[in-house]
Each structure stands twice: as C-alpha cells, then as structure tokens.
Amino acid sequence: MKSSEPAPATPTGFRNSIWFIIFYLFVIQALGSAIISGGIEFAIAYAMYHSRVDLITLWAFPHTISGDCALSLFIQVGLTWASEEILVGFDDYKRPVFRLNKWITKPSPLKTESNEEIPPPKKRFIVDYFESKDNVVAKQNTLYHKHNWLFGYLEVNRGIIPKGKEATLKGFLTSQFIHDSTQSKFMNFIEWFVQKFIRSMILAIAMFIVIWPVTMGILAGIGHKVGSHDYYFNDYPLPQVMKLIYAVVIAFVCTPVAIIVIVLRNQFHEELYYEGLANGTLQQDQEVCSTGNRSSGSTDQDISTTKQQSQEAVA
C-alpha cells in the first residue's frame, strides 16, 4: 500500500482537545449518570429504610448498610457499563466522540515507507503496554499476543469502525451483538453479556477495594455506636443521602472508565484494521469477525467503502 492511501480517520480541532474530552467525560456523561444513579439510589434507600422498626445498622442484619453499599456498587457499575456500551458505542459508530491520538496513538504504519524517522509518542501511558520499543509494524502479530491482556480487556477485535452518514441503528446493534455469524442471535447476546459482565466486574472489584472501605469508615464516624462493634442510623435522611452521594461517586469513576474503554477499543481496532490492509493481511480474529459481520450484512463489503465511511464520520 502506498502512503497516499487513506489512513484511519482522526478527529481534529476542538473534539480532539483535552478540554473537550474532560468536558465530555465528566460533565456530559458522568454528571448525567450521577444524577440518574443518585436519584434511583435515593428512592430505593427511602423505600428500604424509611419507617423501619428494626435498627438500620452498619453491619448487622436485616438492615445492613455495608451489605447494601457493596451490592449497589457492583450492580451500578455493571448497568453503567452496559448502558455506555450502547449509548456511547452508537455515538462513536456514527462519528468518533473523541480519539486519544495525541497521547496514545501508535505511529502509523503508512509512514514506514518514507525515510522520515517516526518520533516516539510524548505520553506513553498506555503505549508502554501496547507498543514495542522500536515501533516496527512487522511485529504487529507479536505485539498482539505479547500484550493480549490489554487487547483482551479492551476487546479490540470487537471494535467498530465509524460509518458516518451510512450509520444505522440496526447496523450498530448487529455489529455490537453479532460476533459469530455461525451462532444464533441468542448465543451471541449471551456471549456479549458475559464479556461485558466480566470486564465491568473487574472494574467494580478495583473500585470496591478503595471506595467501600472509605465509605464504611465515614459511616462509622457519623453513626451512633451500638454494642461493641456496630453503629445504627436514623431511618431518614442519612441513609438516603448517603446512598445518593455513594452513587454519585461511583458514577464519576466508572462512567469515564467505561467510555475510555469503548473509545480505545474502536481506536485500536481501526488502527490495526488499516495496518493489516497496509501489510496485506488482517489479524486473524479481526478477519474472522469481519467475515462474520459481512455474512450478517452489517459491515464492510468493500474496503474502499469502509475507508470513505470512516473519513466521512469525522468530516
């Protein structure tokens, strides 16, 4: 492939600035998620704890706030992850919401034919876990398998190339849920559900290790001591307000992380897709995935069409 052929589409200008990315992650998405999650948790806590005869305690059953907080965290992270996969995933399918190209994009393989030296990225946060020191495109397969834990978590082989004006909800849902055309739609959905559940729970466990103990410490400090090691609370308003704040904190952590995973998945998938074209071969799993999607009529039927759609998506 010649270097004059199209490369992966890259958002430029304001939509690719760090200020837009921060605004999008924490104001547009995380704040909205926090309002919804906080409202739901407040309502649930009101129904659970208001006017209860038994003491509302930190540890003891039947009304244990510690258990409630633990369960709520895992449920909220799982639901947030799934909803962002659909909502943000569809937005990114129509047009990349943003790309982290300035900080973690691999050097384009299309530049390797020139005599210009490829400068290393200024920021190497994720690149260090993704790229080899010399950035040789020929080692693409080696990189893929050597760092498969990152690709595995991001599900890079399930990334979706933006379609621009050609994007449809049906096409997105097919690309999102149908990964193996030889299996039924139900089995494909079960696989999708399991994959998202595993990844969301990995994030939830990491959050639980930090957020839950801190929350329990705060509640122990403001609760009324009962017995040797427990604390009780009034039925209103502390449990309800606490669950609201708890849900807001979770939303501001898990929502940006889920979105970044989606964006990185699509970004890396698109880069590897075009690198495969540049080298005359695609990754095996990407090729199988692409073949399967073609069978379902959801994605690329022609390489040039795909490139044009990808370019139009950010035009």
Curated annotation (Swiss-Prot):
The region called Disordered is annotated at 288-315
Q: Does the keyword Transmembrane helix apply?
A: yes
Bilayer topology annotation: Multi-pass membrane protein
Top-level taxon of origin:
Eukaryota
Q: Which InterPro entries match?
A: DUF2456 (IPR018852)
Q: Pfam families under this entry?
A: DUF2456
Residues of the signal peptide:
none
UniProt keyword terms in alphabetical order: Membrane, Transmembrane, Transmembrane helix
- Subcellular location(s) per record: Membrane
- Main localization category: membrane
Segments traversing the membrane: 18-38, 202-222, 244-264
Q: Name one GO cellular component term.
A: cell periphery
Q: Does the keyword Transmembrane helix apply?
A: yes
Q: Which PANTHER family match?
A: FUNGAL PROTEIN
Something else known: Present with 830 molecules/cell in log phase SD medium.
Tell me the protein's name: Uncharacterized protein YHL026C
